[in-house]
Curated annotation (Swiss-Prot):
Protein family membership: Belongs to the SIMIBI class G3E GTPase family. HypB/HupM subfamily.
Segments of skewed composition (Basic and acidic residues): 14-25, 189-213
Annotated keywords: GTP-binding, Hydrolase, Metal-binding, Nickel, Nucleotide-binding, Plasmid, Zinc
Gene, per the UniProt record: hypB
Amino acids binding Ni(2+) 2: C162, H163, C231
GO MF term (any one): zinc ion binding
Protein name according to UniProt: Hydrogenase maturation factor HypB
Organism: Cupriavidus necator (strain ATCC 17699 / DSM 428 / KCTC 22496 / NCIMB 10442 / H16 / Stanier 337)
Binding, Ni(2+) 1: C2, C5, C7
Entry-linked SUPFAM superfamilies: P-loop containing nucleoside triphosphate hydrolases
Region span, Disordered: 14-37, 183-213
Length: 361
């Protein structure tokens, strides 16, 4: 997972811990009795030789890190991100912003779907304010495509990073007209020694005292995450819901290969269904696989190219489906991370300092 593999903001941590000698080789997890050099918590299939590096309580193996240390790092880093995400979510709810986190593999058609969705929303809900945050490692190509539709967009380039995080989204959102419109009025806040008023000109992610509410959806913020079916699954951005987009050109077993993403999603969109006549893609099997991972997952089939199924997508988005699906997806995601959290208790002794070593000879 990218919290500890080296692509997040704390990418030096694993190497630092490796230098400190905190790595504890896995015991009892190697089935054949023969452990590859430097391996930790790997399960080996005796009949095929296949390696499974997610066998430990942390569900990941990183050279230089014990399983307990890996879990602790994940909790620390994600805990900080989740606090920022909670601020984002509080703001979005207070101002009637429906924030959707679009996640998928590269090339699934996210940006094309966004352009089609923008056109459709303008026809049926011209009153809605729209904005887009684009995430890619490099270039502003996708943001330029969105801006060409007339909708404001901010491009986030993550460099070597493989996902967006809550602070990135907060910083990008502050630069959108959607944010300015939400804060066009002056907020009144009461303190113990009296009242004061101020305008929001500070970092939004750290603002936690909204005292007003908005009824219904007044605007939609689309967040197109970096194309990646692994890392974005565990990073809460403060969104109303995650929407996993799966192209029918990718194969129907993607939900089983990348279960964390589909467990965290409220909705799975099967895109490019106009290509089905030319492919051997079993739609029913794909949906079955996805619901093995997430029984509450809602599924829509559409073609961003032809517009087929887009009306159903808009209905889900604006008629409460996003909110209803988000609660179920949150429960599913919590179940999937329960094992690592429980595992840290069993591995607590690895985090405790060892006995002092006497310097006397």
């Amino acid at each position: 997972m990218c919290v500890i593999c080296g692509c997040n903001t704390n990418h030096e941590t694993a190497r630092q811990d490796e230098n400190k000698g905190e790595h504890a080789p896995g015991r009892g997890l190697v089935d054949t009795g023969t452990e590859p050099p430097g391996a930790a918590h790997v399960r080996i299939d005796a009949s095929t030789g296949d390696l499974h590096y997610g066998a430990g309580p942390a569900h990941v193996s990183v050279p230089g890190l014990s399983q307990a240390r890996a879990i602790k790092l994940e909790q620390d880093v994600l805990g900080h991100n989740n606090r920022l995400a909670a601020h984002n979510r509080q703001h979005f709810v207070a101002h009637g912003v429906l924030a959707l986190n679009l996640v998928s593999s590269p090339g699934s058609g996210k940006t094309t779907l966004l352009c089609t969705t923008i056109e459709a929303l303008r026809r049926c809900r011209a009153d809605l304010q729209l904005a887009v945050i684009e995430g890619d490692q490099q270039t502003s190509h996708d943001a330029e495509r969105i801006r060409a539709t007339g909708v404001p967009a901010i491009q986030i380039n993550t460099g070597k990073g493989c996902h967006l995080d809550a602070l990135m989204v907060a910083n990008a959102y502050e630069r959108l007209p959607l944010h300015a419109a939400a804060h066009a009025h002056t907020h009144e806040h009461r303190q113990e020694d009296g009242q004061h008023s101020h305008h929001h000109d500070h970092e939004h992610a750290r603002h936690d005292h909204h005292d007003h509410r908005s009824s219904g959806i007044g605007s939609v913020l689309f967040i197109e995450n970096v194309g990646n079916l692994v890392c974005p699954a565990m990073w809460d951005l403060g969104e109303s819901a995650k929407v996993a987009i799966l192209s029918v050109t990718e194969g129907e077993d993607k939900p089983l290969k990348y279960p964390d993403m589909f467990a965290a999603a409220s909705l799975m969109i099967l895109n490019k269904i106009d290509l089905l006549p030319h492919l051997r893609f079993d739609v029913a099997r794909c949906i079955e696989y996805a619901r093995q991972v997430n029984p509450h997952l809602q599924v829509l089939q559409l073609s961003a190219a032809t517009g087929e199924g887009v009306d159903e997508w808009l209905d889900w988005m604006l008629a409460g489906g996003a909110a209803a699906g988000a609660a179920a997806a949150t429960d599913g995601a919590r179940m999937r991370i329960a094992a690592p959290e429980a595992g840290i208790a069993a591995l607590g002794t690895q985090l405790a300092p060892g006995p002092a070593v006497s310097k006397e000879m």
